[in-house]
Amino acid sequence: MATPAAVNPPEMASDIPGSVALPVAPMAATGQVRMAGAMPARGGKRRSGMDFDDEDGEGPSKFSRENHSEIERRRRNKMTQYITELSDMVPTCSALARKPDKLTILRMAVSHMKSMRGTGNKSTDGAYKPSFLTEQELKHLILEAADGFLFVVAAETGRVIYVSDSVTPVLNQPQSEWFGSTLYEQVHPDDVEKLREQLCTSENSMTGRILDLKTGTVKKEGQQSSMRMCMGSRRSFICRMRCGNAPLDHLPLNRITTMRKRFRNGLGPVKEGEAQYAVVHCTGYIKAWPPAGMTIPEEDADVGQGSKYCLVAIGRLQVTSSPVCMDMSGMSVPTEFLSRHNSDGIITFVDPRCISVIGYQPQDLLGKDILEFCHPEDQSHLRESFQQVVKLKGQVLSVMYRFRTKNREWLLIRTSSFTFQNPYSDEIEYVICTNTNVKQLQQQQAELEVHQRDGLSSYDLSQVPVPNLPAGVHEAGKSVEKADAIFSQERDPRFAEMFAGISASEKKMMSSASASGSQQIYSQGSPFPAGHSGKAFSSSVVHVPGVNDIQSSSSTGQNISQISRQLNQGQVAWTGSRPPFPGQPSKTQSSAFGIGSSHPYPADPSSYSPLSSPAASSPSGNAYPSLANRTPGFAESGQSGGQFQGRPSEVWSQWQSQHHGQQSGEQHSHQQPGQTEVFQDMLPMPGDPTQGTGNYNIEDFADLGMFPPFSE
């Protein structure tokens, strides 16, 4: 039996607002109707609830969501600001070309903090130190290499916490004078404020204009100032520190000590009663005090006075810009000094060498006109020179004038001056002068020349060591007893000792007539050396005495006369001073040797040649002329032809007929100014190809070194 709801389902469904009537099956329709009726009921309730929220609760919910977004935005902005400040405070981050990301900034900040606390490299701590060195030895080596001293001062108060014992050789102050004092007491009064700024770790009035090296622009310090003043930032400054005046005799006088003394005196001499200061370059870092993991005793707690930071630095003597006498002059006493003037001649700088040159201290000359020290008669000249050097603009101008020294004496000074121009504005900045004491400079130059002359005069030429040669062996291979017998400057006028050292093998080639040492060999200045001429000339052509020295034919006499005139222009003669030979005639003869009837030479020509003995040196044939028929062309008409034994006259006539044509045709073709060419003209005479090779006999030349024997 159907229920009333099921009797009219479409009608019931149509009564429900929002429902849709569908033609469905009865059973399905009943279920559909129930579902459809339930869903609108829920939807109506939800709408009513939403309507209530819109009316009553929509405002607070929207406000809470907006408030939450604003909080998150402000939080992100604050975090970005803090990370930006952290990036500025960490040196590794600020040194980057572009801004790093947040993670990189945090990582670098952690690394920087670890490095400051000393916990960043625990694994490698001490690995740099050699195993054989203790901590104290390593500290001394480091300080000695740095040539400085280590000191630690409190940042807030400047109290000295620690100073190394190397302060004693650097500043001549004992270590005890630094302990218990402040660093402000050790520096010059004018440098206290600069030191206070370097020790300060908080923001102060230092924030000013800085130069950006990357862009080249000048800008104000902003966040970089906090980075410069933060803990762990580097410090580097120059100040004047007080030096002790106690002599330190126990220190060794070495190069380092001399350099320290020179640098300490770089600021000039100290007046009596004033403290001496040295320029010290301090480099270090601001560190946390006390260090991490370190506790200080109670008695030392008041030293830091509750300080949180300290300066750990090394102080080293700074090389001063003032020139020092020993640096700029090698002399023991300087002769010049530098000065700088403005365009009006006012002295603005003087180097300390003026003390030794003119007697004034540098501070006595500063701010004064150079004309005040010039002689009245030279003032106009000096004034004109300064005006001229200003017009020259860079060119050097020298002037000499009289300068009044401190002891009221007039000193002749030479000043070489030139101007320095500003490269940007092309304006003259100042005038640089080099002032030289002329008299003292001349004295030093004279002393130097005397010293050089003394050094040359003490050099004995007679004691020059000779290279070690075999005993008694001459450079040409001949055996002599005294190496300098031939080349001696002081020699017997008749050259008696020239044949004293000849060996027995050479004596076989000499005749008995040449054994007398009192004979004159040749005239002085002869182009052919006397005696062993083959040894005197180290050329490839060997001079054979007796063949090359004396010729007797008229044709060869003319030839020799022409050669002699050519050789006399560039002849080789003895350079030593010898007394003139008695009876020496004037050189007006046509012969090269000037042997005439009035000459004191003996009539026997065999005394002139060691090869004149027919048994020892005459070859079989016409290789050598017999010299038997000498003509007046040789200027020896008073001699007979029978003096040369064993050389028939037909040999000479045959040689003359064969060689006269060739000699007359070639007498101008091979003549050279040198002596070697004469030998080349004469030596082919014995071995002319027209004579045939049969004229030579090797056995006849057994005693001559120029024809070594060989076995066929």
From Swiss-Prot:
Region of interest (Disordered), residue spans: 36-73, 573-712
Keyword Cell division (UniProt): no
Phenotype upon changing residue 422 to A: Compromises SIM1:ARNT2 heterodimer stability. Does not compromise NPAS4:ARNT2 heterodimer stability
Keyword terms of this UniProt record: DNA-binding, Methylation, Nucleus, Repeat, Transcription, Transcription regulation
Family matches, as Pfam families: HLH, PAS, PAS_11
One GO term (biological process): positive regulation of transcription by RNA polymerase II
Keyword Disulfide bond: no
Tissues with expression: Restricted to adult brain and kidney.
Effect of residue 106 to E: Compromises SIM1:ARNT2 heterodimer stability. Compromises NPAS4:ARNT2 heterodimer stability
Subcellular location: Nucleus
Gene3D superfamilies reported in the protein's UniProt record: Helix-loop-helix DNA-binding domain, PAS domain
Biased composition (Basic and acidic residues): 63-73
Bias kind Low complexity: ranges: 597-626, 653-675
Positions where Omega-N-methylarginine occurs in the chain: 42
Domain PAS: from-to ranges: 134-209, 323-393
Annotated phenotype, changing residue 340 to A: Compromises SIM1:ARNT2 heterodimer stability. Does not compromise NPAS4:ARNT2 heterodimer stability
Domain PAC span(s) in chain numbering: 398-441
NCBIfam families reported in the protein's UniProt record: sensory_box (TIGR00229)
Function: Transcription factor that plays a role in the development of the hypothalamo-pituitary axis, postnatal brain growth, and visual and renal function. Specifically recognizes the xenobiotic response element (XRE).
Name of this chain's protein: Aryl hydrocarbon receptor nuclear translocator 2
